[in-house]
């Protein structure tokens, strides 16, 4: 049984993964973006009585990241993420920066803090929540997709780098969810239309773009999150984990086929 820290447990996949891992006997630090989310999760756990505690860890906040420095963490799951959307031709670069700050730079900083203890103990496990969009980008969702492409590279390099340390066993793992009905995709897509309808190169095509993007997720989203949550479990528990875990299976096959055809 392991001590597992997960970021972004206030809702969605992170919340479900935290509850599932705790129900399997692991001690889970189910961290959230806000104090209110942590309070609600702790109140629910009074009934569940799972080996789980929740507290605020806003990945953007240095003081929050420092809270975990002395925790005995066996597995870190960098799950927290935000999305943004719009064309590279015109989106405010600060929106791009903000997405990278939350999805890439802050997880790197948190990973460095947790790794100090893991390297000292010579064991641990680092998991990054990437995405199938990290290998199969979607036009107008580039702020989000590009952060996931970055995590693919970061995960690969860190995994190889840690193997250079003698007698240290810290695998680095990527989890790549496809499209799931958590509400995240709709929120991500909607952000661009707040400003593109006012002033955009594409304003005459906004309605068509809007219909197309919402239809795409309506057709592809899986309503059963169990398939991807069990990948969190496998990544945390398997004695010899794979580098990459993908779900749903069909969406993973489509992404692989598209990458092959591009070549």
Region roles according to the model:
Residues 10-11:
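Conserved glycine-rich cofactor-binding loop
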Residues 79-84:
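Conserved NAD(P)H cofactor-binding loop of Rossmann-fold oxidoreductase domains
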């Amino acid at each position: 049984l392991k001590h597992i820290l997960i970021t972004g447990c206030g809702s969605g996949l992170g919340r479900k993964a935290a509850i599932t891992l705790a129900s399997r006997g692991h001690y889970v630090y189910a961290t959230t973006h806000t104090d209110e989310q942590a309070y609600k999760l702790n109140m629910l756990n009074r009934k569940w009585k799972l080996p789980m505690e929740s507290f605020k860890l806003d990945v953007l906040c240095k003081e929050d990241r420092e809270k975990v420095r002395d925790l005995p963490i066996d597995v870190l799951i960098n799950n927290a993420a935000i999305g943004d959307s719009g064309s590279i031709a015109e989106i405010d670069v600060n929106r791009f920066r903000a997405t990278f700050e939350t999805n890439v730079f802050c997880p790197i900083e948190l990973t460095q803090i947790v790794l100090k203890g893991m390297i000292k103990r010579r064991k641990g496990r680092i998991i990054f929540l990437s995405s199938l969009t990290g290998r199969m980008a979607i036009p107008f969702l580039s702020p989000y997709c590009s952060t996931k492409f970055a995590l693919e590279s970061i995960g690969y390099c860190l995994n190889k780098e840690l193997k250079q340390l003698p007698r240290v066993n810290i695998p680095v793992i990527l989890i790549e969810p496809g499209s799931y009905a958590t509400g995240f995709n709709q929120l991500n897509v909607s952000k661009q239309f707040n400003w593109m309808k006012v002033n955009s190169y594409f304003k005459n095509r906004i309605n068509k773009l809007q219909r197309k993007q919402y239809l795409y997720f309506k057709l592809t989203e899986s309503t059963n999150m169990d398939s991807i949550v069990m990948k969190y479990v496998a990544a945390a528990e398997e004695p010899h984990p794979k580098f990459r875990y993908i779900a749903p299976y069909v969406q993973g096959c489509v992404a692989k086929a598209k990458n092959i055809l591009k070549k």
